[in-house]
């Protein structure tokens, strides 16, 4: 979303983003004001992962709507269009605000697996098992809609009622509309036609990053062969110490140096040997061109950045669309999908062994040339043309 907001501003549009406070620094880089909404995403994720009894999806939904919808309502004042992405509940609140104010509404998904299609099944919903004898994708998507209603219907409709709006009986389709955008690269995440509604695939919304790498990191890169970069990004990772040990041992087993991204798991090095370096948030667009491989959680942004850099990747998916991205990486032959969310030294070393083969490296290099970098600008132009028309 930050890349899209920056592209809109570069084209002369007045833009404001209503989002959790975690995004303030990113938005400052593109000169777009943040209207804070809700609690920190990092803190919310930490609480969910740390809790012995995680809150129910319905309780989380109610909390997200309560924390964000009023802020969205204020931020939308005077706007011509409201673009929503991300969590269903946050988008549902935004949709209700746009409906109440009579503002044009657009929804963008970051992966095809969030949009109903006859060509693949939906992501599974926690606590909503699918009958084993059901294999028709359209039926599975109908069951998915029912599950979404069961989880999110009450809090979404309660908020709508507070605005004097009627209830909706299909939260998922209400949020995504019949003309959503797909903010994902067509090579990595193609939208398959024919489908039941009109999807506009804009390409991934990449935020250009021109920041130099820190001096210590530059020195480490220059001191030896390209390392393997490992980070789980925004995933807290239970048993982080054991995960860090498994990661370092797995990379060393492949005869490679280790670049450990601390991420929200706060991973730390297991010893003081000079073949390892821990780094925080850095310019991944520059870094990934200089590593032997990338091990990550499978977020849409990290997967796209890695593919665009031409680095082979190992995806260790944790939740949601990360499973989709892991499968796409494996299907394209640009890396491997780790089996399960918790890597061991042995399992990760085996996955890296495949990712580092000459065949996978060559395939990753070839696919890199097909990844578009103009998705955010394309989407911004499309939106401004629609508003002007």
Which ranges hold each PLM region?
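Nucleotide-activated sugar donor-binding and catalytic core shared by glycosyltransferases
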Residues: 1-16, 22, 26-29, 56, ...
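Donor-nucleotide binding loops and adjacent catalytic segments primarily
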Residues: 5, 184-293
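Conserved nucleotide-sugar phosphate-binding/catalytic loop shared by glycosyltransferases and other
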Residues: 16-57, 133-136
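Generic beta-sheet signal
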Residues: 18-20, 37, 106-109, 202, ...
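Short gly/pro/ser/thr-enriched loop/turn and capping motifs at secondary-structure boundaries
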Residues: 24-25, 41-44, 107, 111-118, ...
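Conserved nucleotide-sugar donor-interacting segment of glycosyltransferase catalytic cores
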Residues: 66-138, 187-189
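Structural motif
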Residues: 80-81, 179, 227, 293
